């Protein structure tokens, strides 16, 4: 930073003259020309790339839930809170931003916690051509609503029971556990959202 001004000398006598003449230390700054620090404009290409990456990650998570609903969860519908997969994708991008290979070095294990038991749903490798540098374990949580069990009770006794399976409702909360694979210390970060 370069500052110029009307002071010819910066010795203590010159400064004391200014202070005695009615200048206040706060007003000294207004007498100098100075460089303003300008925040750089965000790179539009980076913003578009990050948004595209986030949307691709959202699609991966939604496909994982869609594949798992009948095979591993045994239900006909999975109700996902609005913007849940978007929030998860943003957190995954944030956690991967400090990694050497970024999101490309991520392996994500997707689980569902039902009544304090974790059920494995899928394993997502973000880029198979890159050696993984960290693992993320995503744990979806089931919504604990009493009305869902009543609905299942009433529909399971009628003539509609053969065609209907239960509906799984996900909670808006989730857990992300990050484990670095290249660190000797084995750094683990747990985020509860």
UniProtKB/Swiss-Prot annotation:
Asked if RNA-binding is a keyword of the record, the answer is no
- Note the Pfam families from the entry: RTP801_C
GO BP terms: negative regulation of signal transduction
InterPro entries in the record, alphabetically? RTP801-like, RTP801-like_C_sf
Cell compartment(s), UniProt: Cytoplasm
| Domain of life of the native organism | Eukaryota
Keywords, sorted A to Z? Cytoplasm
Gene Ontology CC annotation, any one: cytoplasm
Q: Which family does it belong to?
A: Belongs to the DDIT4 family.
Function, in words: Inhibits cell growth by regulating the TOR signaling pathway upstream of the TSC1-TSC2 complex and downstream of AKT1.
PANTHER family documented for this protein: DNA DAMAGE-INDUCIBLE TRANSCRIPT 4-LIKE PROTEIN, DNA-DAMAGE-INDUCIBLE TRANSCRIPT 4 PROTEIN DDIT4
- This one is known as DNA damage-inducible transcript 4-like protein
């Amino acid at each position: 930073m370069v500052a110029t001004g009307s002071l010819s000398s910066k010795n203590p006598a010159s400064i004391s003259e200014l202070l005695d003449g009615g200048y206040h230390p706060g007003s000294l700054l207004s007498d100098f020309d100075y460089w303003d620090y300008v925040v750089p404009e965000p790179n539009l290409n980076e913003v578009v790339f990050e948004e595209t990456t986030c949307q691709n990650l959202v699609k991966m998570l939604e496909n994982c839930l869609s594949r798992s609903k009948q095979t591993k969860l045994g239900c006909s519908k999975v109700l996902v809170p609005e913007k849940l997969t978007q929030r998860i994708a943003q957190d995954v991008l944030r956690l991967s931003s400090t990694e050497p290979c970024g999101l490309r070095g991520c392996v994500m294990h997707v689980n569902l916690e039902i009544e304090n038991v974790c059920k494995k749903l899928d394993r997502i490798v973000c880029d198979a051509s890159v050696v993984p540098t960290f693992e993320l374990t995503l744990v979806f949580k089931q919504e604990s609503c009493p009305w869902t069990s009543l609905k299942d009770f009433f529909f399971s006794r009628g003539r509609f029971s053969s065609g209907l399976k239960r509906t799984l409702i996900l909670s808006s909360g989730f857990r992300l556990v990050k484990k670095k694979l290249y660190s000797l210390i084995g750094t683990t970060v747990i985020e509860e959202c």
